[in-house]
Amino acid sequence: MAGQVLDGKACAQQFRSNIANEIKSIQGHVPGFAPNLAIIQVGNRPDSATYVRMKRKAAEEAGIVANFIHLDESATEFEVLRYVDQLNEDPHTHGIIVQLPLPAHLDEDRITSRVLAEKDVDGFGPTNIGELNKKNGHPFFLPCTPKGIIELLHKANVTIEGSRSVVIGRSDIVGSPVAELLKSLNSTVTITHSKTRDIASYLHDADIVVVAIGQPEFVKGEWFKPRDGTSSDKKTVVIDVGTNYVADPSKKSGFKCVGDVEFNEAIKYVHLITPVPGGVGPMTVAMLMQNTLIAAKRQMEESSKPLQIPPLPLKLLTPVPSDIDISRAQQPKLINQLAQELGIYSHELELYGHYKAKISPKVIERLQTRQNGKYILVSGITPTPLGEGKSTTTMGLVQALTAHLGKPAIANVRQPSLGPTLGVKGGAAGGGYSQVIPMDEFNLHLTGDIHAIGAANNLLAAAIDTRMFHETTQKNDATFYNRLVPRKNGKRKFTPSMQRRLNRLGIQKTNPDDLTPEEINKFARLNIDPDTITIKRVVDINDRMLRQITIGQAPTEKNHTRVTGFDITVASELMAILALSKDLRDMKERIGRVVVAADVNRSPVTVEDVGCTGALTALLRDAIKPNLMQTLEGTPVLVHAGPFANISIGASSVIADRVALKLVGTEPEAKTEAGYVVTEAGFDFTMGGERFFNIKCRSSGLTPNAVVLVATVRALKSHGGAPDVKPGQPLPSAYTEENIEFVEKGAANMCKQIANIKQFGVPVVVAINKFETDTEGEIAAIRKAALEAGAFEAVTSNHWAEGGKGAIDLAKAVIEASNQPVDFHFLYDVNSSVEDKLTTIVQKMYGGAAIDILPEAQRKIDMYKEQGFGNLPICIAKTQYSLSHDATLKGVPTGFTFPIRDVRLSNGAGYLYALAAEIQTIPGLATYAGYMAVEVDDDGEIDGLF
């Protein structure tokens, strides 16, 4: 009786059906799950085209997306590798297969080896083959044909363990890997090949024979005859891998397909045998589909796992060394390693040296299905001029969360300006054992974002003054128009910005030659009133001599002079736009909306009118990408944007927050806990915190889960009647000796800040930032007052001296607070009047009785209302050293009238800002300035900066 046919076609069909069902099942709870196989074919070989069609058809049946990339025969190796690299980096591509053979001019090994092992679903890359050949190896994928052979044997209930197997053929594609698989399943394996003498002698006692020698009917049927010549006790299972075409005049094609085994004879003597075609071939394709599914599931599972961010150990010293000494004593992680720990792909990362990099905002799109992590705002009580340690607390908190409690956490902070760094303020990287490293790179230039803001701002300023010059010196409309819209190669064309201006003016024309004289005048003349220009040039250095200058004094400017001045770069509205934009499109639209002046008819003139929107966006294209750095304990920090806290929101960017919240977020069905994003707002909560909620949260659509309010014994003593604290002078003894009475009186300021936070419906944790001279009695007084005022918790934190270890209790309190319900609401309705919004902030946040709007401020308010800008949120610029407008009023002043001296528009950023006093928007340098101590040694190490 003849043996039986082992039908690979039917088995493959069952596998494809099972794969399709499993995909549908997963999609039931993960709708976005879509296994994707990329197939690269170079050239037009008919056999390759046939195999590709088979794979695409099988993918369709299995519910797998097949992305077919067909390259011309002449494609260079560089081009093919570029496609492979793109697919390697594409998170939507789970498997990659390069159809072989490739044209002769291409190196197959180099190209196939370029495929990432995690996407090498063919299983033949060096990593997967290498792991397969190790005794305890762990390949990502088994090669498809050998895997299909094993599955066929299992399907036929063939016992592999303890069997004797003979493999005829030693190729890297089938022979060698199938031998390894059989061996790993405890079969005793003999490998033979075309040069082996008397192959038939090896087959008599074989239980399993795999033939992959590539020669038509090389193995004769009679080789399987039992030694005694009978046909009894047939036990051999034959797997024929061969695919050979031999002449057959009876076929229409003139050829027929045969295997490496003489099928018609062998079936007489064996138990099972695979046919050709219809045996191993369909199983190979089915295993390709199964490997693709495995890859997609593995990626899904990896994305659902909590982030693992191994900490860097700290060697704590007493007394605590200087910040720069601590920074240099710690060897940071390579930034690409930290990015990998965060789940950032290499194509989403742009390295700037070893320890800083930019992150593509496209991370947000890739992780769009994730639920955001927990969002924590760090703010403070009304500070002394020495500061109370918000940045240090931010770093200590994330170090505690990640390095000591195993919770993924990212700190999001502003980029410091060079001006204060080289002036009197020093760096802004935190301090002690809670800081960003390398701190010199953090404080100097970083990746050049501030310089990009400066270039963009100054281009705009130059464009405004130059436009006024050209309009004034060219009186004839037609002549001016011809120069504004010149002919190139005999044709005139509006730029995109010009076309947008035409549309806003209601001129629905696209051909420059079609405009009437009236339309030409309306379009070409901006008629800027020079007295209304709000844009100043900027520089990122403290330079008091630039506060007021006269431009246009060169003879070439024909007496077109104008008094103007410089701002520090971070005071530019473009910096606020960078901080508040949700994405590149939003940034471009905001830039276009910036009002630079009014025309002679009091109508607003925008960046879009000047024609600068595209150019400014181009200059800021890279600046919109957040910068990745790390803390002393190797936890991630995103550094992005640095709007001037005096007249702007004083917070890092919306984009950085959105990126970070997705990176530490969780997939909808994941059972892991979300991580934490800890950001901060400038000055005290009454200023930075209020702006954060009413301006930044309106722009981002995000709301914090908790607020950390930083308080110090020193600051509360200042508000409780202790002598003033002055920078550069020794602290009065009241601050270094126990004085609980001062603390208890000053605690009223903290309690007012707690009440202010609670008006937004968010839980608040008070962080008592510990100093060496603080006593237990003073700290206990603060905690008691905080809890009585409604704080969720009040915790002492010693992160400056101990790093994350010193902030563990604070981190635990923040975790608990962030799990409390939030009843968030804004302080005011943006659609209420400007006057009402100002009054609400002054009364509810500052404790004032009323506002006093000076005539010039009222004139501007009326103008902004007339121009349609009355429904914007409000930013109030005032002193940071008092809840009121008067820095000498400590504690919790009440009943005062708050002056509004001026109101200005930041339409691109999306707010009005009112000034309670004259604010210097470019600082000066002191007699002794920070830059005087800076030196650089022969190795490039910077000394004296901090």
UniProtKB/Swiss-Prot annotation:
Main location: cytoplasm
Keyword Membrane listed: no
Region (Formyltetrahydrofolate synthetase): 320-946
Gene for this chain: ADE3
GO cellular component term, pick one: cytosol
Binding residue positions for NADP(+): G169, R170, S171, S194
Region (Methylenetetrahydrofolate dehydrogenase and cyclohydrolase): 2-319
Other known facts: Present with 35600 molecules/cell in log phase SD medium.
One Pfam entry name: THF_DHG_CYH
Binding site for ATP: T384, P385, L386, G387, E388, G389, K390, S391
Protein name: C-1-tetrahydrofolate synthase, cytoplasmic
Biological or metabolic pathway of the protein: One-carbon metabolism; tetrahydrofolate interconversion
Upper classification of the organism: Eukaryota, Fungi, Dikarya, Ascomycota, Saccharomycotina
Subunit structure: Homodimer.
Keyword Nuclease: no
Gene Ontology molecular function, alphabetical: ATP binding; formate-tetrahydrofolate ligase activity; methenyltetrahydrofolate cyclohydrolase activity; methylenetetrahydrofolate dehydrogenase (NADP+) activity
